[in-house]
From Swiss-Prot:
Residues linked to a glycan: 89, 99, 111, 241, 403, 417
Gene Ontology CC: one annotated term: extracellular space
Organism: Oryctolagus cuniculus (Rabbit)
Gene Ontology terms for molecular function: cholesterol binding; cholesterol transfer activity; phosphatidylcholine binding; phospholipid transporter activity; triglyceride binding
Gene name in the database record: CETP
Location(s) in or outside the cell: Secreted
Gene3D superfamilies registered for this protein in UniProt: Bactericidal permeability-increasing protein, domain 1, Bactericidal permeability-increasing protein, domain 2
Lineage of source species: Eukaryota, Metazoa, Chordata, Craniata, Vertebrata
Tissue: Expressed by the liver.
Record PANTHER family: CHOLESTERYL ESTER TRANSFER PROTEIN
Disulfide bridge map: 144-185
Signal peptide: 1
Name the record gives this protein: Cholesteryl ester transfer protein
Function: Involved in the transfer of neutral lipids, including cholesteryl ester and triglyceride, among lipoprotein particles. Allows the net movement of cholesteryl ester from high density lipoproteins/HDL to triglyceride-rich very low density lipoproteins/VLDL, and the equimolar transport of triglyceride from VLDL to HDL. Regulates the reverse cholesterol transport, by which excess cholesterol is removed from peripheral tissues and returned to the liver for elimination.
Top-level taxon of origin: Eukaryota
Family of the protein in this entry: Belongs to the BPI/LBP/Plunc superfamily. BPI/LBP family.
Amino acid sequence: ACPKGASYEAGIVCRITKPALLVLNQETAKVVQTAFQRAGYPDVSGERAVMLLGRVKYGLHNLQISHLSIASSQVELVDAKTIDVAIQNVSVVFKGTLNYSYTSAWGLGINQSVDFEIDSAIDLQINTELTCDAGSVRTNAPDCYLAFHKLLLHLQGEREPGWLKQLFTNFISFTLKLILKRQVCNEINTISNIMADFVQTRAASILSDGDIGVDISVTGAPVITATYLESHHKGHFTHKNVSEAFPLRAFPPGLLGDSRMLYFWFSDQVLNSLARAAFQEGRLVLSLTGDEFKKVLETQGFDTNQEIFQELSRGLPTGQAQVAVHCLKVPKISCQNRGVVVSSSVAVTFRFPRPDGREAVAYRFEEDIITTVQASYSQKKLFLHLLDFQCVPASGRAGSSANLSVALRTEAKAVSNLTESRSESLQSSLRSLIATVGIPEVMSRLEVAFTALMNSKGLDLFEIINPEIITLDGCLLLQMDFGFPKHLLVDFLQSLS
């Protein structure tokens, strides 16, 4: 069981509003149809006393559905209680075999078997509670009602005597009502829990990649109001199933509205948790070949024949050069009203190997970089917008140097021919290069990488309408509308088969 209360501590919050439920309700019929078809209908046997015939033994066997259709359904949210679904005019045709036996007035034992169909019309009312157990959302439908508006028995060929049809119409009506209520309601409850697990597992999959996972266990029972339902999750990212848990913040419900279909709230602690996992995974690294670096520079309008580049390469062929950028420690992320602020310490290395392979020129320097970024999503792509940046030499850290480190490596010695003034000039030029070319290039590659990752998780299959990414102090908000996710329904129904 999970606690209930007025304070909701979480790293991630998901709010689904009434407009979203109305869209999702469009395909409720298919889920209910699956419940009817998956439900097992047991054989029933017994006996009854019939005037003039004595004891009549009977049995219903192989009861199954031959036709099923649903006219309409409605959904309502009952504040602090349940999700109520009303399904009208469920038309069901059952078929099966009726066995009966009795002793005739002449002392003969009569044992007959006849196929039958039952044509029925039913209304279904399901009131579902949301709870949680062991970090997962659970559903419970204590109120599940079936109302029969029609129940007609058709015996095979209608050749049997009228008393038989009358007798078994009454019996089958009573028996079928009991069986349907028990079996169908139980199956609906089972499918509801399977769906809850399916959604939570799919959400975790979207946020995971490789050895990076996420713990989206719920921190309390979901909240139901008259206009939305809401779940609260831990949001701890993991690396190789190991996470560094952080204290969860209290989520203020007033931050999210109910006019859009879907809302997400992310504490910036979650973003820091993701950055830590990515750093541990070794993903915060960028490597370019000389030709790739040259192409990047030319794309930004730089003349690679300038003196600075000749000084860098020292006349060595740039095609075999290597440029590497990597984070020295876990970046720090904070959400502010103006955007997402990322503080990172990076090392940049330029390496120019000589053709003989015996020596190479290498340049390395370290920078503390602070960027302020806003994000948007459109046309199934993520876009990052650089609002501001600062590049500061890493002179304040123990063991680091503000000066450019230059080395000419040979088999026997290491020498440097750069004068101090020339080194400072080159260093200044390289820092300018990082600011004007490096940061935009990294952001561009992040856009492509994040978009590819999201699409690999199937995000491009969703019809996301007018998404907004909003930053506030301490949190990131996503809000959007959407079309019915038919691919998810197909996947879910296939998982039931």
